[in-house]
Amino acid sequence: MKHLLINLISFLLLSPFLTSCEKYVGEYKDGKRNGQGTITWSDGKNYVGEFKDGKFNGHGKLTWSDGKKYVGEWKNGRPHGQGTGTLPDGRKYVGEYKDGKKWNGTVYDNDRINISKYINGVKQ
Protein backbone atom coordinates (compact mmCIF):
# COMPACT_ATOMS: atom_id res chain seq x y z
CA MET A 1 0.00 0.00 0.00
CA LYS A 2 2.86 2.34 0.85
CA HIS A 3 4.46 1.78 -2.60
CA LEU A 4 1.13 2.36 -4.32
CA LEU A 5 0.69 5.67 -2.51
CA ILE A 6 4.25 6.76 -3.38
CA ASN A 7 3.71 5.85 -7.04
CA LEU A 8 0.39 7.70 -7.14
CA ILE A 9 1.91 10.84 -5.61
CA SER A 10 4.87 10.65 -8.03
CA PHE A 11 2.53 10.33 -11.00
CA LEU A 12 0.43 13.29 -9.87
CA LEU A 13 3.52 15.45 -9.41
CA LEU A 14 4.99 14.49 -12.78
CA SER A 15 1.81 14.46 -14.89
CA PRO A 16 1.95 18.19 -15.81
CA PHE A 17 5.36 17.56 -17.35
CA LEU A 18 4.18 14.46 -19.18
CA THR A 19 1.37 16.35 -20.90
CA SER A 20 3.60 19.20 -22.06
CA CYS A 21 5.66 17.13 -24.50
CA GLU A 22 7.48 19.09 -27.13
CA LYS A 23 9.16 18.40 -30.44
CA TYR A 24 12.17 20.49 -31.49
CA VAL A 25 13.58 20.66 -35.00
CA GLY A 26 16.54 22.94 -35.51
CA GLU A 27 20.13 23.81 -34.79
CA TYR A 28 22.16 22.87 -31.72
CA LYS A 29 25.46 24.13 -30.38
CA ASP A 30 27.16 22.73 -27.29
CA GLY A 31 24.10 20.59 -26.57
CA LYS A 32 21.70 23.56 -26.48
CA ARG A 33 19.25 25.01 -28.96
CA ASN A 34 21.15 27.68 -30.87
CA GLY A 35 20.30 29.29 -34.20
CA GLN A 36 17.05 28.68 -36.10
CA GLY A 37 14.50 26.19 -34.85
CA THR A 38 10.89 25.20 -34.31
CA ILE A 39 9.23 23.86 -31.16
CA THR A 40 5.78 22.29 -31.26
CA TRP A 41 4.06 21.35 -28.00
CA SER A 42 1.41 18.67 -27.64
CA ASP A 43 -1.16 21.33 -26.63
CA GLY A 44 -0.82 22.99 -30.06
CA LYS A 45 1.48 25.84 -29.06
CA ASN A 46 4.24 26.52 -31.60
CA TYR A 47 7.42 28.65 -31.71
CA VAL A 48 9.38 29.36 -34.88
CA GLY A 49 12.48 31.49 -34.64
CA GLU A 50 15.90 32.03 -33.17
CA PHE A 51 17.45 30.47 -30.07
CA LYS A 52 20.48 31.25 -27.96
CA ASP A 53 21.66 28.94 -25.19
CA GLY A 54 18.36 27.04 -25.31
CA LYS A 55 16.11 30.10 -24.95
CA PHE A 56 14.06 32.15 -27.42
CA ASN A 57 16.44 34.90 -28.49
CA GLY A 58 16.37 37.14 -31.57
CA HIS A 59 13.34 37.20 -33.85
CA GLY A 60 10.55 34.66 -33.47
CA LYS A 61 6.85 33.88 -33.49
CA LEU A 62 5.00 32.11 -30.67
CA THR A 63 1.46 30.93 -31.44
CA TRP A 64 -1.02 29.37 -29.01
CA SER A 65 -3.73 26.91 -30.05
CA ASP A 66 -6.45 29.44 -29.14
CA GLY A 67 -5.14 31.90 -31.77
CA LYS A 68 -3.14 34.16 -29.47
CA LYS A 69 0.31 35.04 -30.84
CA TYR A 70 3.42 37.13 -30.36
CA VAL A 71 5.69 38.07 -33.25
CA GLY A 72 8.84 40.03 -32.61
CA GLU A 73 12.10 40.21 -30.72
CA TRP A 74 13.05 37.93 -27.83
CA LYS A 75 15.78 38.05 -25.20
CA ASN A 76 16.45 35.28 -22.67
CA GLY A 77 13.13 33.58 -23.44
CA ARG A 78 10.98 36.70 -23.02
CA PRO A 79 9.55 39.28 -25.42
CA HIS A 80 12.08 42.12 -25.48
CA GLY A 81 12.34 44.81 -28.16
CA GLN A 82 9.83 45.50 -30.92
CA GLY A 83 6.90 43.13 -31.26
CA THR A 84 3.20 42.58 -31.74
CA GLY A 85 0.98 40.59 -29.41
CA THR A 86 -2.40 39.58 -30.83
CA LEU A 87 -5.40 38.12 -28.97
CA PRO A 88 -7.93 35.72 -30.56
CA ASP A 89 -10.57 38.49 -30.73
CA GLY A 90 -8.27 40.65 -32.89
CA ARG A 91 -7.09 43.12 -30.25
CA LYS A 92 -3.37 43.72 -30.45
CA TYR A 93 -0.50 45.49 -28.77
CA VAL A 94 2.11 46.97 -31.12
CA GLY A 95 5.30 48.41 -29.75
CA GLU A 96 8.20 47.80 -27.42
CA TYR A 97 8.45 45.04 -24.84
CA LYS A 98 10.91 45.03 -21.96
CA ASP A 99 11.64 41.82 -20.04
CA GLY A 100 8.33 40.31 -21.18
CA LYS A 101 6.20 43.35 -20.31
CA LYS A 102 4.49 45.87 -22.55
CA TRP A 103 6.69 48.96 -22.37
CA ASN A 104 6.13 51.67 -25.01
CA GLY A 105 3.34 50.96 -27.48
CA THR A 106 -0.31 51.08 -28.41
CA VAL A 107 -3.24 48.70 -27.90
CA TYR A 108 -5.71 48.52 -30.79
CA ASP A 109 -9.12 46.89 -31.09
CA ASN A 110 -9.90 44.60 -34.02
CA ASP A 111 -10.78 47.65 -36.19
CA ARG A 112 -7.32 49.16 -35.58
CA ILE A 113 -8.79 51.88 -33.35
CA ASN A 114 -6.46 53.04 -30.59
CA ILE A 115 -7.72 51.77 -27.22
CA SER A 116 -4.82 52.67 -24.93
CA LYS A 117 -1.09 53.28 -24.73
CA TYR A 118 1.78 52.06 -22.60
CA ILE A 119 4.53 54.49 -21.66
CA ASN A 120 7.53 53.15 -19.73
CA GLY A 121 5.51 50.07 -18.77
CA VAL A 122 2.52 52.02 -17.41
CA LYS A 123 -0.89 51.76 -19.09
CA GLN A 124 -2.17 55.28 -19.84
Language-model features, listed with the residues they occupy:
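Glycine/tyrosine- and acidic-biased, solvent-exposed loop/turn segments at the edges of beta-strands
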Residues: 5, 12-124
